[in-house]
Structure formats: structure tokens, C-alpha cells
């Protein structure tokens, strides 16, 4: 358990107030929750549903610095995590994981969520492939070179472009599915 984790409510609340977790030390890292760093380097550590939840809640909190009320069941459905709010529900596990890794913290029925993420600690780098460890170090060097106020984690060396999701205006077609 992380020092940043506050005591969670006894049960997952039906609604909670979402607020940005303002932490100047982390905000200075300049890896927004919507960055490639979050999606690529944090994903194998936090897991896909937790990263998706972090990106969704972090973006929402960043856009609403005074806070916003979140319907937990709707959030779960929007993330593809089902309807349940029980102790063993997917949304409860996802929110617990966010808090366990210091990406969010409960304060009564309020959830403070990070809008930027810190660099992955060395102890977690062992879980990553050599390519992702290299990407992590490359992005940290780039962030350090940009200085405070720069936007790190969005643009990085071409040598790592194969690891990044590729955007395309072409619809993706898969057997048996409809292009969106």
C-alpha cells in the first residue's frame, strides 16, 4: 500500500465527488494522464482498466478543477466494467488499484485523482520489457531537457515510434466487426 492512499469508503459509493489531486512535485513531471507515457509505460503495471479509468477521471478532473459529481455505476458502464458496485465488482477493484498505486486517494466520499503521473519507480521497471524500459528512460531524458512547463510524454524520439499507437484516418476493419 502506498503512503498516498487514504482509507477508502467501506463500500463503493453510488456517487462521489471527483477533484483533481494537486501535487506540485508530480505536476512538474509533466506526464499528463492522457500522455503516451501513461498509455505505454504505465499500462503493463496498472492494467488496462485502471489506465483507462485514470485517463477518464484525470481528464475530467483537469477540466473541472472545482470538482464534479460522478455516478459510479455509469462510470463502470462507460469503461466496460459492468454494473455492479459490490466489494468484488470490477469498478471497485479498478478504483482500489488506482488508490493502491497512488494515482488517486479517497477522502470520505470524495476521490482526488492525479491529472499528471510521476515517472515509474525503479522497482516497477523490472516488470517492463527492455523496449519499454528504454522508452521510459528516453522520455525522462526528453522531459528533463524541456525544463518546467514543457509538455513531456507527448512527443518522443522516432526510434521508439513502433511502440506508440498509430493514429490513422482510415477505418480499422477486422473480420466480423463493423468499422467505427
Where are these regions (language model features)?
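Short recognition helix of helix-turn-helix/winged-helix DNA-binding domains
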Residues: 1-74
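Short, flexible loop/turn elements at secondary-structure junctions
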Residues: 50, 83, 117-121
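Winged helix-turn-helix DNA-binding recognition segment
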Residues: 61-114
Amino acid at each position: 500500500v502506498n503512503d498516498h492512499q487514504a482509507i477508502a469508503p467501506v463500500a463503493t459509493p453510488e456517487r462521489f465527488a471527483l477533484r483533481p489531486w494537486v501535487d506540485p512535485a508530480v505536476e512538474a513531471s509533466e506526464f499528463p494522464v492522457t500522455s503516451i507515457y501513461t498509455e505505454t509505460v504505465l499500462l503493463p503495471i496498472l492494467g488496462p482498466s485502471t489506465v483507462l479509468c485514470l485517463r477518464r477521471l484525470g481528464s475530467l478532473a483537469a477540466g473541472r478543477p472545482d470538482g464534479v459529481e460522478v455516478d459510479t455505476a455509469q462510470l463502470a458502464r462507460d469503461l466496460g466494467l459492468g454494473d455492479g458496485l459490490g466489494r468484488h465488482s470490477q469498478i471497485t477493484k479498478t478504483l482500489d488499484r488506482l488508490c493502491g498505486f497512488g494515482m488517486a486517494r479517497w477522502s470520505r466520499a470524495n476521490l482526488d485523482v492525479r491529472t499528471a503521473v510521476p515517472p515509474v519507480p525503479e522497482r516497477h521497471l523490472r516488470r517492463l520489457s527492455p523496449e519499454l524500459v528504454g522508452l521510459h528512460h528516453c522520455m525522462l531524458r526528453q522531459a528533463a531537457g524541456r525544463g518546467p512547463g514543457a509538455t513531456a510524454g507527448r512527443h518522443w524520439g522516432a526510434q521508439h515510434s513502433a511502440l506508440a499507437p498509430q493514429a490513422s484516418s482510415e477505418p480499422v476493419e477486422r473480420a466480423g466487426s463493423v468499422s467505427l
